[in-house]
A protein has these predicted regions:
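Catalytic cores of phosphodiester-bond hydrolases, prominently lipid phosphodiesterases
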Residues: 1-182
Length: 182
């Protein structure tokens, strides 16, 4: 409701007219929860990015469903007011960025580097390869369960990872503000 009120008052959410990404992390039953979510999203359709008949229209808020994702229910919705948070294995399949605009995965399942000292070159190369795959497919990339480390944040930033996840928001904010403009 607060986002919708801001949208109604200003005609947008963010000042630069970019789309805000709203990640909805489903922890309970995927199908039952999505059924409720889908009904709620329709009420805010004016501000939500939408895919209809395979045509995407970006609006003020783009909803991405994460966690327990009801893949077929989301994919078959038309119009569709939510997208799917993909996994790294989705990069090796022909899954469109219209349905999978974001790829998220558990850092610890794919990398041994824990943010202390220098990242091994083989892992740095692997990270850059994954980033390249995502960008080539028009998808954004993020990892969860990352170490809370400026050394790792620097590696993610240098590699071009789109979103850096953290539980230490102030610390990451201050660190990002200290970085040179890119």
């Amino acid at each position: 409701q607060p986002l919708f009120q801001r949208f109604q008052d200003n005609g947008c959410i963010l000042a630069d007219d970019c789309s805000l990404t709203l990640l909805v992390d489903i922890k309970s039953s995927a199908e039952a929860t999505y059924a409720v979510l889908a009904r709620q999203l329709v009420q805010y359709a004016d501000m939500l990015s939408v895919t209809k008949d395979d045509q995407f229209q970006q609006r003020s808020v783009t909803v991405i469903v994460s966690g327990n994702r009801p893949l077929e229910s989301i994919a078959s919705s038309n119009p569709r007011y939510a997208c799917v948070d993909g996994r790294l294995e989705d990069l090796n399949q022909s899954k469109t960025s219209l349905l999978y605009p974001l790829i998220s995965d558990n850092w610890r399942l794919h990398f041994r580097y824990r943010g202390q000292g220098e990242m091994p070159q083989a892992e740095r190369d692997k990270l850059r390869e994954v980033v390249g795959q995502a960008k080539t497919q028009g998808k954004r990339l993020r990892f969860w369960a990352t170490p809370e480390s400026p050394d790792l944040w620097q590696e993610l930033l240098d590699a071009g990872v789109d979103l850096i996840g953290t539980d230490q928001l102030t610390r990451l904010h201050d660190w990002l503000r200290s970085q040179p403009k890119r």
